[in-house]
């Protein structure tokens, strides 16, 4: 079979290895290739312009590639990673799948839930960790998948047993073109889910037509306190605060519902679940606090790549003066809602990256103190010169990092290095 993999990344490379083992003819197409060549694994790689849909029997698209891309438009047999994997399931092996999506919190919640479900041999994958084809080859029985809006957009058949949607705020508008498309992508899976499946959804979307028309069973939530009350857990029983408390509460809710489906009693598992969850360590670059050599508090929230994540970070330090490093690739999002919230804070901005002058213009409009630093190191230097012991220095950029860094991780690591440098 002639297979075209659109995009040359972790997901498609894993698929390429699987197809190669099964004696298929595999070609990769990617904008980053300027001419044809063989990569280090011996795969044939071509520039996107060389793709011929008449010379291909199956195309699987890397989720980061937009539906407006010429490769996607030309493809005649386009299938998502999720739908292809779904086509492999049979009577011999079909895993139980829990999907977690949302603008923010999905990585943390996926990691928390996977840990809670360890006794059921749960493994995480999708957007984090392992590509789905590798989970399939390992025959892992329970998949907890962090699922992006990109993957959901392209998927037309596959659905999970439980779908958790944590939140939806403006993000990835360059890819989706507008917020309505982004919202519809996040909700699309509900059109595929049958009566035997369960969707756990934000209350504010209860009246949305897609949700109203979905056959799936539904649970709606609003605040973490309400979720914990439903589970008969006092809010002080968990050691998390702010957005992380909601992540933890939702992980427990999904766990409770999974146990219910398995005809197991929540009360038999509750105390152990709380103990394990309270031992969970939040990942790097997510509200990660550290102190400089003078004992002043700095916070690495480099993973805050959108407005909502930054707003959640600010709430944690509501009563302190905040020196906020903001900027990067804002992905077509209007930052005005963020600036409207700044009036509730004592805040000084340090603008970096490709959106620095957009931030400066908004700061002037909203009368917020702002220095255009462009470079992260310059922003750190400026803050170092004025930061007092009772103030907070916060990197929570509300933007992706790829205009200046290889990833949000590199941005966070460099931030810490600049702070700790003499």
UniProtKB/Swiss-Prot annotation:
Record EC number: 6.3.2.9
Matches recorded under SUPFAM superfamilies: MurD-like peptide ligases, catalytic domain, MurD-like peptide ligases, peptide-binding domain
Entry binding sites for ATP: 102-108
GO biological process: cell division; cell wall organization; peptidoglycan biosynthetic process; regulation of cell shape
Protein's recorded name: UDP-N-acetylmuramoylalanine--D-glutamate ligase
HAMAP family the record matches: MurD (MF_00639)
Pathway per the UniProt entry: Cell wall biogenesis; peptidoglycan biosynthesis
Subcellular location: Cytoplasm
Gene Ontology annotations for the cellular component aspect, listed alphabetically: cytoplasm
Alphabetically ordered keywords of this record: ATP-binding, Cell cycle, Cell division, Cell shape, Cell wall biogenesis/degradation, Cytoplasm, Ligase, Nucleotide-binding, Peptidoglycan synthesis
């Amino acid at each position: 079979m002639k297979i075209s993999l659109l995009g040359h990344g972790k997901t498609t490379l894993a698929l390429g290895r699987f197809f190669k083992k099964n004696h298929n003819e595999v070609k990769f197409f990617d904008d980053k290739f300027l001419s044809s060549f063989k990569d280090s694994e011996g795969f044939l790689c071509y520039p996107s312009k060389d793709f011929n849909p008449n010379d291909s029997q199956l195309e699987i698209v890397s989720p980061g590639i937009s539906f407006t891309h010429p490769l996607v438009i030309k493809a005649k047999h386009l299938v998502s990673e999720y739908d292809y994997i779904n086509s492999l399931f049979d009577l011999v092996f079909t895993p139980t799948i829990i999907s977690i999506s949302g603008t923010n919190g999905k990585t943390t919640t996926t990691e928390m839930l996977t840990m809670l479900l360890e006794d059921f041999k749960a493994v995480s994958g999708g957007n984090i960790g392992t590509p789905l084809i590798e989970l399939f080859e390992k025959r892992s029985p329970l998949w907890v998948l962090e699922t992006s809006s990109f993957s959901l957009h392209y998927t037309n058949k596959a659905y999970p047993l439980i779908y958790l949607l944590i939140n939806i705020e403006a993000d990835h508008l360059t890819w989706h073109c507008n917020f309505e498309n982004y919202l519809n992508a996040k909700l699309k899976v509900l059109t595929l889910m049958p009566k035997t499946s369960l969707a756990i959804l934000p209350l504010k979307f209860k009246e949305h037509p897609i949700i109203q028309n979905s056959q799936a069973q539904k649970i709606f939530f609003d605040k973490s306190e309400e979720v914990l009350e439903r589970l008969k857990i006092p809010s002080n029983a968990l050691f998390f605060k702010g957005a992380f408390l909601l992540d933890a509460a939702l992980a427990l809710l999904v766990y409770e519902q999974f146990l219910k489906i398995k005809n197991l009693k929540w009360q038999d598992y509750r105390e152990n679940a709380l103990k394990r969850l309270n031992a969970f360590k939040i990942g790097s670059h997510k509200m990660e606090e550290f102190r400089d050599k003078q004992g002043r508090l700095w916070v690495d929230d480099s993973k805050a790549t959108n407005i909502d994540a930054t707003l959640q970070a600010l709430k944690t330090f509501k009563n302190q003066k905040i020196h906020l490093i903001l900027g990067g690739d804002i992905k077509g999002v209007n930052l005005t809602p963020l600036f409207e919230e700044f009036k509730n804070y004592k805040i000084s901005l340090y603008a970096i990256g490709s959106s620095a002058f957009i931030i400066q213009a908004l700061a002037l409009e909203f009368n917020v103190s702002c220095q255009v630093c462009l470079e992260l190191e310059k922003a750190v230097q400026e803050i170092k010169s004025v930061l007092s012991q009772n103030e907070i220095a916060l990197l929570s950029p509300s933007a992706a990092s790829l205009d200046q860094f290889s990833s949000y991780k590199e941005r966070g690591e460099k931030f810490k290095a600049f702070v700790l440098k003499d």
